[in-house]
């Protein structure tokens, strides 16, 4: 009996010892797994010892970094190596011996490899997080065998393929995050697979399907789902039905932005938990459900921007809203008569009308208020008294008039943009007393007098020493007077200084060279005299002092800028070793610019297209620093909340990453081509944007200098140059070569669509192609890219916010690609990426120069003067191109000399940039027409249209202006002095015609002989007919018939 008791006691001791011991199999599995891991800082393996270093091989290795054991059984239950700077190709099959592993978390490293099916054999796993790495391949179907799994995060990797079936088996799953991969599947089928989940983030993938689903498809998650993010996918069809959306009783966050969801929104009924609703960048239309703006739904954030909503918004009585974005829709009527509560309000890009002063009645006290690009009128209320917290104010591009109100109190204004209105009178002194102001844009108004200064020399243009934060000052296109003071150098942080198109005078102070951060300086179209100061900031990428009365020698450090930075005007300004500028056509005649609307048009390109966009992003970048994430992804998990701070960046990557000889300065500010709120408001909800994450892994976030110049057209400095006027966006001068850095295939989620079978290339080949900037336009930026085989392409990057939805874009691109004509440069392909800044058009690169270069480039003269017969040949070939397009009911839409290329040796015409408006949103088309109008090529009927769109007859008008330019060798933007005062080109030609002196208009280079004088007069008569009123204007076939009948 005693032997039996002894045996039982020893057996119990052995059993107890084994229950608290790690097995050798587990240790060996761990050590095998370690072999694939490297520390990126030391390039060594992670410091796990082998079993020989353990005092007792059966002891749990709790001292190994990231390893945890069960205190009761001793088995390894957790491997947590989050954000340790590790890399390596992991072999997940080596973990099969860890049969009791509960937590495997490897996020935020640089691991790669495939997730093998055997991982599904570790049925004890409860938490699996492989996010923010480089894992690739399909998600194995056996992952559905992890019965105990409650948290699965595979986001921000390179997984691809279909969504695996069998997720219905994961009854314990509460959080599913697969965002930023290449996974596809029908969202309706996926909803059917999920059971009891609370958090679902499938954003930035390729999921498709609609949301108008039967109740049985969503019944398994309708009671539990709290957070749903399907943004940046390819969803189409309708939104949830009224019945189905009403079944989600616990839903807190819904983000479906950047899809193709269409139709009207249903009534939302009772949604007691809904706090964030983001439906921006879809195809929704109809009325905005009123309950979304009332307190019945406790929304904190509502973003319906960039859709097609219509109707009026009478009142907004929600007491919970902190962010409301209804921008870029078709909303109309008066501004809401009441607005209870909100911190960020964006109603821009609609057609709201009425008196802007109604905002004084609002109870809301916003930090950010954007009412830009509407039809508002009336006078501006004093916002410092109405909104004490206001830091960002934009009312640009309206019809608000009267004098500017004074600002006072403890306001902390960061950005004020009142450009493109009808303000008059003096600028109040108080605008220059807010030390926090970083950006002030009062351009394109009717302001006069000096820029005020609180000091003894108030009559001069001075800058306050107490104004250290100013980074952008744009007062262009007004009637300001006075001198530029010597102490302007106190604006130490200024990056953009635009004082063009005013009546400023005096000499340029030498203290301009103290503006060490200056990137853009435009002092053109004033009456400055004297010499240009030496040693201006070397990093400037936009510089223009043309149309002044400067003299002396151009400083050596400025001689890399093109001639259009200095001329026309400045007839006494010279450059050693070069022929002086031809001043015979000098446009700096006294009083020229202030007596003509065209000088104002020219400045629109800088002040409107660039500054207005950029200002809005300065503004929001500042505002975002004051907002906190109130609801992060990790609310539904046990992860550290610090992880999502990277999604709060204000910058977004450009498709092209430049590396050039232009020095780039760092800045605390970041600028984006996207909208004021839609790009960055996701930080409020903790929902990441695809773009923000790419800047983490794919390319550095764009700094202020880079995007500053993308959005702010250079005033003929290094970055771009003029085609007929000093501020136009034509590609007259090339930049230094830069590298075209498209995301490589392992990161490039979009597709190349070929419209011509003869073109064959891959995204990888495009990504490594050396490229140089050719120019910028209202559409975006133009590059020349050289492929591996030497073939050269012209790549047009389309600016964010201009492009139609993918289906419409593809349909129209196919039509444009089908156009085949010997004088038309064909569209060969296009690239469509998941991010808005990834829209590219590809065509063959042409050797040759634009018609604008042949007509106007004279410093030095690079081209022989064109004869009348050569000019007539150009006109006929352009008309033939237009006839081809018009026969297919497709207007060119952007016809100007910079889009007419003359190929050697016989100056054969090749037309470019045609029909691009068909790929653009209505706002993008309107912006293109605005720029056409600024340059003088837009038909008058387009300027007065509420929703302008290019027509066949507007092409004829533009052709008529170009024909006048061919015959007169004067630019459409020229201001010409005559007996009746300063007039533009078309008015001058009409006047000459009325007075019977047509030959006075003809260019001296071709008007000398009598042989072709009748032909020249006949051609000029054709041009005049082309610019008649739309009802009297001939069609292009009639124009071509007349031109071909002229002898030359």
From Swiss-Prot:
Residues 696-733 are annotated as: Disordered. ATP binds at residues 774-782, 796. The modification Phosphoserine is found at residue 744. One of its GO terms (molecular function) is protein kinase activity. LRR repeats lie at residues 100-120, 124-146, 148-169, 172-194, 196-217, 224-246, 250-272, 273-294, 298-319, 320-342, 365-387, 389-411, 412-433, 436-457, 469-491, 493-516, 517-539, 540-560. The protein kinase domain is predicted to be catalytically inactive. Residues 716-733 have a biased composition (Low complexity). Residues 768-1045 form the Protein kinase domain. Residues 1-21 form the signal peptide. It is a single-pass membrane protein. The keyword Transmembrane helix applies. This is Probable inactive receptor kinase At5g10020. Keywords: ATP-binding, Leucine-rich repeat, Membrane, Nucleotide-binding, Phosphoprotein, Receptor, Repeat, Signal, Transmembrane, Transmembrane helix. It holds the Pfam family LRR_8. Coiled coil: none annotated. PROSITE patterns: PROTEIN_KINASE_DOM. One of its GO terms (cellular component) is plasma membrane. The chain crosses the membrane at residues 602-622.
